[in-house]
Amino acid sequence: MTTMESLIGLVNRIQRACTVLGDYGGGTGSNAFNSLWEALPTVAVVGGQSSGKSSVLESIVGRDFLPRGSGIVTRRPLVLQLHKTDDGTEEYAEFLHLPKKQFTDFALVRREIQDETDRITGKNKQISPVPIHLSIYSPNVVNLTLIDLPGLTKVAVEGQPETIAEDIESMVRTYVDKPNCIILAISPANQDIATSDAIKLAKDVDPTGERTFGVLTKLDLMDKGTNALEVLEGRSYRLQHPWVGIVNRSQADINKNVDMMLARRKEREYFDTSPDYGHLASKMGSEYLAKLLSKHLESVIRTRIPSILSLINKSIEELERELDRMGRPVAVDAGAQLYTILEMCRAFDKIFKEHLDGGRPGGDRIYGVFDNQLPAALKKLPFDRHLSLQSVKKIVSEADGYQPHLIAPEQGYRRLIEGALGYFRGPAEASVDAVHYVLKELVRKSISETEELKRFPSLQVELAAAANSSLEKFREESKKSVIRLVDMESAYLTAEFFRKLPQEIERPVTNSKNQTASPSSATLDQYGDGHFRRIASNVSAYVNMVSDTLRNTIPKACVYCQVRQAKLALLNYFYSQISKREGKQLGQLLDEDPALMDRRLECAKRLELYKKARDEIDAVAWVR
């Protein structure tokens, strides 16, 4: 059977560890960790300025230790962890930010709270969500943890931003919104409960009242003839937990430094002898409130432990997976660094080849270049213009010169064919460029998909540069090859193709008297348009044959010179150069993204926190 001390102490230890790591709730964004703090049951003390909130806390502790003054005094959350010690032991306090330093003078505790507040917020009345942790060890307290939050206010004082009221409420809400937060709502009895800032906020976040404890202060300051029974007995505002009345020290008592133990006795006497509240005396006062909260907190902790363990185990799994993805810290040994770089290059190369071979998307775009882009480009070549009747007549005439051809204008044919074949250079080079750009995109995509490389932006840049440099060399070789294919077609025409064409001798054009035209007539006048159309048709047929050939051979050249080489030797030059580098240069390639290094460190710290918390819970024999 677990004890109240062990359960509340367990939560105290986990809370302190959370604060050290910066986990005090309110984490947002895709990179935010699960907040262990928010899963822990807490008691948040909420009240307006001058509600008597500080006096209630001091009554529970039995010590005068909180800063006092006008305006906003509490400007950072104060996590107050109370530890009951054996009777006769000396009281002392410890701050989380001053480990192993014990304060026995509680006036110095007050000063340190003020100084530590100013260290974060400055002295200009600003507020901060970063909590101060204060542990008090005393035989006069119960085991309990309370979070003192800044007092709710409506107006800003000099030196504060105009949004201070909204800022404070927003901070308070980050605590009380959480389902594991117990709300201790402090309201003064000498004001209408309907106007209580604490009750308004509690009702907003806890409309059923199951998480709210109402505390009514300043009962002794109410007008004569009036009392607060309507509230204390739950008739004017009902909560699921009983209201507790408190009588704090008067300002005169505070000025005289009246002992808190004496103040407790006076409070008990007030309720015991009060004609209005005597019947409620056993359930009134700061001592009863402390015991009530301690018992309830222990009960809530016991109930929540299974869900806390579930969150911890889930978070441990997620963090371990993330750390695996990010990889271990980089080795400092040059040999190990070189091995790490080569392993990552091999991982990249594997992914790159998978894109080309169909294991991943992207390689099909190269086929699209050959099956769609190249044929479309070949169809768009201006052969119709080149082989128009006017163009054929002009080229044949220029090829004949001063001696017209006798039967077939061979020189004209050759000029027409060579001119037409020159157009194939454009689609050939465009195919090479298109394949090059696909390969470059696959390099970029493969680098981004290589998990191991994500840690090292410098290596990513150098690897991309090396791969693209190799692709550029492959492109140049490929262009030479495809241009060579076109030039080969121009260099030697297939005469057999023309021998198989139907042969028709064109008869010279005769004059009206059935006489042959004069030899001195222009060449173009010797043959009819049909002769030149037949030449254009023959040349077109030959060009189409060459086009079909190039449509098959250009892809072969691109694949052989670019795709095949990219698979075989994309990083060969990089490998030869990287092995010559010294340790410092290798280390520069393995400089990680600072954000990633920070994330790994945070993950490792958070993982340590969760594992420690799990061990702490396992060490407590709590009853399920």
UniProtKB/Swiss-Prot annotation:
The keyword Secreted does not apply. GO terms for cellular component: cytosol; microtubule; mitochondrion; phragmoplast; plant-type vacuole; plasma membrane; plasmodesma. Ubiquitous. Residues 217-220 are annotated as: G4 motif. The gene is DRP1E. Keywords: Acetylation, Cell cycle, Cell division, Cytoplasm, Cytoskeleton, GTP-binding, Hydrolase, Microtubule, Motor protein, Nucleotide-binding. GO terms for biological process: cell division; defense response to fungus; vesicle-mediated transport. Belongs to the TRAFAC class dynamin-like GTPase superfamily. Dynamin/Fzo/YdjA family. Microtubule-associated force-producing protein that is targeted to the tubulo-vesicular network of the forming cell plate during cytokinesis. Also plays a major role in plasma membrane maintenance and cell wall integrity with an implication in vesicular trafficking, polar cell expansion, and other aspects of plant growth and development. Has a GTPase activity. GTP binds at residues 50-55, 218-223, 248-251. Residues 148-151 are annotated as: G3 motif. InterPro entries: Dynamin, Dynamin_GTPase, Dynamin_GTPase_CS, Dynamin_N, Dynamin_stalk, G_DYNAMIN_dom, GED, GED_dom. GO terms for molecular function: GTP binding; GTPase activity. This is Phragmoplastin DRP1E. Forms homodimer and may homooligomerize and heterooligomerize to form the phragmoplastin complex. Binds to PHIP1. It comes from the Eukaryota.
